[in-house]
Amino acid sequence: MRPRMWLLLSAQLAALHGNSVLQQTPAYIMVQTNQMVMLSCKAISSSTTRIYWLRQLHAPSSNSHHEILAFWDSSKGTIHSEGVEQKKITVFRDGSLFFLNLTRVKLEDSGTYFCMVIGSPTLIFGTGTQLSVVDILPTTAQTTKKSTPKKTVCRLPRPETRKGPLCSPITLSLLVAGILVLLVSLGVAIHLYCRQRRARLRFMKQFYK
């Protein structure tokens, strides 16, 4: 990349971020070291023939330093900048999508990555993708759900249902004995009533003779 172009990119980058012509996904990604990362940039215009990929190592500002990694050209393919490890960075196109593939990332690869096209007369940048490279991915803390106390429902005891015969043998014996006593008493009462009646009739016959 020519020095004049490098200075031009650095001077205009801060004011031209986030143009809707270039849409980048994802906006943020976190990966472990030695893993692979693929960033994408969608060009709204189908006439795009060259696209650049840049990396910003610090938070965006007017004095931020931007590093041009590589660019893709429709006639030349992938062109890497000087000092860039070519085996680590791959740039390719699939239709309206342009991809930046990073392999075996390290902690120093963290930063914000931008795709860019040279317009007329301005430079057009994508929305940017923030890459964070860590040794160990943070574990997601599980949210504890508050247990809702259950309402205590008072239930009345159910009457026990007895199974088997309703009366025991002793109860049946007492019941039969009571019936027999009643029958005997009734028989004695009837017998006495009959004797009294016969005696009354006999007395009346003797009285009227």
UniProtKB/Swiss-Prot annotation:
Q: Which residues form the Ig-like V-type domain?
A: 22-131
The signal peptide here is 1-21
- Residues annotated as coiled-coil are none
Q: What is the lineage of its organism?
A: Eukaryota, Metazoa, Chordata, Craniata, Vertebrata
Residues linked to a glycan: 101
Do you know which InterPro entries this protein is assigned to? CD8B (IPR042414), Ig-like_dom (IPR007110), Ig-like_dom_sf (IPR036179), Ig-like_fold (IPR013783), Ig_sub (IPR003599), Ig_V-set (IPR013106)
Q: Which domain of life is it from?
A: Eukaryota
| Purpose | Integral membrane glycoprotein that plays an essential role in the immune response and serves multiple functions in responses against both external and internal offenses. In T-cells, functions primarily as a coreceptor for MHC class I molecule:peptide complex. The antigens presented by class I peptides are derived from cytosolic proteins while class II derived from extracellular proteins. Interacts simultaneously with the T-cell receptor (TCR) and the MHC class I proteins presented by antigen presenting cells (APCs). In turn, recruits the Src kinase LCK to the vicinity of the TCR-CD3 complex.
Report disulfide bridges, numbered on this chain: 41-115
Write out the PTM section of this UniProt entry: Phosphorylated as a consequence of T-cell activation. Palmitoylated at the cytoplasmic tail and thereby targets the heterodimer CD8A/CD8B to lipid rafts unlike CD8A homodimers.
Q: Name one Pfam family in it.
A: V-set
Gene Ontology process terms (BP): adaptive immune response; regulation of immune response
**Oligomer status and interactors:** Forms disulfide-linked heterodimers with CD8A at the cell surface. Interacts with CD3D; this interaction couples TCR-CD3 with CD8. Interacts with LCK.
Q: Name one GO molecular function term.
A: MHC class I protein binding
Q: What is this protein called?
A: T-cell surface glycoprotein CD8 beta chain
Q: What organism does the UniProt record list as the source?
A: Saimiri sciureus
Q: Where are the transmembrane segments?
A: 170-190
Spell out the subcellular localization from the entry. Answer: Cell membrane
Please give the GO cellular component terms listed in this UniProt entry: cell surface; plasma membrane
Cytoplasmic compartment residues: 191-209
Indicate how the chain sits in the lipid bilayer. Answer: Single-pass type I membrane protein
